[in-house]
Every structure is written in C-alpha cells, then in structure tokens.
Amino acid sequence: GPANXIPIVSRREWGALASEXSANL
C-alpha cells in the first residue's frame, strides 16, 4: 500500500516495495 508519509509500514508492504525495486524510502 501507499507508505508515503507513513512512519510505520507493515512488513508485507516493505516486501512488496522491495519486490518492486522501489524500496528507496
């Protein structure tokens, strides 16, 4: 999900972002 501005993100979100290669938060 949109982790924009959200300080705490679920590990599932991080995993999804990592898989998308956009884990540059």
UniProtKB/Swiss-Prot annotation:
The species this protein was found in: Sus scrofa (Pig)
Protein name in the entry: 20 kDa neutrophil cationic protein
